[in-house]
UniProtKB/Swiss-Prot annotation:
A GO BP annotation: cellular detoxification of aldehyde
Organism: Saccharomyces cerevisiae (strain ATCC 204508 / S288c) (Baker's yeast)
SUPFAM superfamilies to which the protein is assigned, alphabetical: NAD(P)-binding Rossmann-fold domains
Predominant cellular place of this UniProt entry's protein: cytoplasm
Binding site for NADP(+): 18, 37, 46, 66, 164, 168, 197, 199
Family: Belongs to the short-chain dehydrogenases/reductases (SDR) family.
Name of the protein described by the UniProt record: Uncharacterized oxidoreductase YKL071W
One GO MF term: oxidoreductase activity
Length: 256
């Protein structure tokens, strides 16, 4: 097997939703190796579909990662290096997130703020700190964060998503900072809005807004597969001059 020409992806959060569909689509090409993380036991129902797919496609390798646990984050690089034929990571994709904060700012509990920040902003950055040396082993050096327009200041969405929006705004700031810090080493760091997606998490939000009689009739709702497919099309077009930018799933440039 010629492994030197293969593209290796590391996807955080590949067990379901957008992350699973990224794994599914990218692993369909035999020229790709997809390393993806799951949270919790492989036997859990939420991890079953990616575990089953990995049994069929030998270019999928699964590692354990809990973005809220220091020990788990600390072990992630070693877990990745144990995967078959590992030579380095070409493209890092942080996709895991939590979104269950539909409170007004003055009503949001401290635990909700901290959980969203830990999972959506701090966790992916701490994981990147650990796998950064593995990205240096390859010349591709692309880092993609699945963010959200909910974290945009200049394109503010007038919905009460408090802790979720704040956590994505923090992630977006990290993207901008990383883009200039890592540029001298040839990295391209980009944030992406995946659209309004009918994942379990997205559907929970949609149901909440409907229950509160909030008009979302103008929102284009897409499936996880549609989002992942569109994102991959944009991923493939990313050039070094796109470093530090924010793109929508349809390829249009967003604003921070």
């Amino acid at each position: 097997m010629n492994t030197s020409s293969r593209i290796t992806y590391f996807i955080i959060g590949g067990s379901r939703g957008i992350g699973f569909n990224l794994v599914k689509i990218l692993s369909a090409s035999t020229g790709n190796t997809v390393i993806t993380s799951i949270r919790g036991s492989p036997s859990l129902p939420k991890n079953k579909q990616v575990e089953d797919l990995a049994k069929i496609r030998k270019n999928i390798h699964i590692v354990q990662l809990d973005l809220t646990k220091d020990e788990s984050i600390g072990n992630i690089a070693d877990e990745i290096k144990k995967t078959p034929f590992f030579l380095g990571i070409d493209i890092f994709i942080a996709c895991s997130a939590v979104s269950d904060s539909y409170y007004k700012v003055l009503e949001t509990p401290k635990s909700v703020w901290l959980n969203h920040y830990s999972t959506n902003a701090l966790g992916p950055i701490l994981a990147l700190q650990k796998v950064y040396p593995l990205l240096l082993l390859k010349k591709t050096r692309k880092i993609f964060f699945i963010s959200s327009v909910a974290g945009s200041i200049n394109a503010f969405v007038p919905l009460s998503v408090s802790a979720y929006g704040q956590s994505k705004a923090a992630l977006n700031y990290a993207v901008k900072t990383l883009s200039f810090e890592l540029k001298p080493e040839g990295f391209t760091v980009v944030a992406f809005h995946p659209g309004m997606v009918s994942t379990d998490m997205g559907q929970y939000g949609l149901d909440h807004f409907k229950e509160k009689n909030i008009d979302i009739s103008g929102v284009n709702i897409i499936t996880p597969e549609e989002s992942a497919s569109a994102l991959i099309d944009v991923f493939r077009k990313i050039l070094p001059e796109d470093n530090g930018k924010f793109f929508n799933y349809d390829g249009s440039e967003g604003v921070f």
